[in-house]
Amino acid sequence: MKLTSEKLPKNPFYASVSQYAAKNQKFFQWKKEKTDYTHANLVDKALQLLKERILKGDTLAYFLRGQLYFEEGWYEEALEQFEEIKEKDHQATYQLGVMYYDGLGTTLDAEKGVDYMKKILDSPCPKARHLKFAAAYNLGRAYYEGKGVKRSNEEAERLWLIAADNGNPKASVKAQSMLGLYYSTKEPKELEKAFYWHSEACGNGNLESQGALGLMYLYGQGIRQDTEAALQCLREAAERGNVYAQGNLVEYYYKMKFFTKCVAFSKRIADYDEVHDIPMIAQVTDCLPEFIGRGMAMASFYHARCLQLGLGITRDETTAKHYYSKACRLNPALADELHSLLIRQRI
């Protein structure tokens, strides 16, 4: 399973680019006078402002310019900026760790990425403190994936527990969610631990864990079965953009014979573009691409089944084949599993 890096944590002592710019009188006046500005205009103006501050010796402006490049997807420029200040700015060091590990703006070098994250985790400097939980999560990811270090689930678990910090909302919520996923997929499974960590992460706002909790309630995994609680979690997660929760709601509607509702809901999900929408949704929701694809595959399969049998929609076997094929492309293993249920007339 391919995981994703923890985004740069917010530092209460550092302003963001937008906050930094908003406090600048020249920038504020420019926005007031120019009412038809675009995003590109704002970026250009922010870069101009940051350049002026850099020339005046503002050390924070160096990092903020690199971060602006990073957020705009100009990774080569961001890398160059962060490399210049890595010895003076822990946030730059952190971002370099992410960029080398994920190959953003440079050739992928997982070992170098791991080294930068270890520097953050081992740093005694108070200015690195807010980065330590996130660095521990990223190091746990490296051990889990076996990239840059020798693979070790035990070391990954140890680091994620450090990062999760007993459910602290100011720690790595991503690590809390990952522990929920880890305990529910390892052998042997530890479902009560999985439920605990998904509950902690969900309480701290994690969208992936909210959907996972819904499924654990629905099937009585690690907790007593509770359909009402399951549907509440799944619906709220679906409304917030969790595609895997959406796919599982489609399955629930089909099994409950709410075919009209199933068709309407499944079509919207099944029509997501598998190439462009999955990475975009992952970026916006911070959900894992694998589960986004799984949710889309589930919706595609059930939409195809409704079309094939004329359930809640006019029968159309040609279009049904299109959606069956899409389900197979998105997740062959899931499509095969659902096809087996279909053959046994379970769906």
From Swiss-Prot:
Its main location: cytoplasm. It is found in: Cytoplasm. Pfam families: Sel1 (PF08238). Transmembrane segments: none annotated. The keyword Repeat applies. Sel1-like repeats lie at residues 93-125, 133-168, 173-206, 207-242, 243-277, 297-332. TPR repeats lie at residues 59-92. Interacts with LRP2. This is LRP2-binding protein. The gene is LRP2BP.
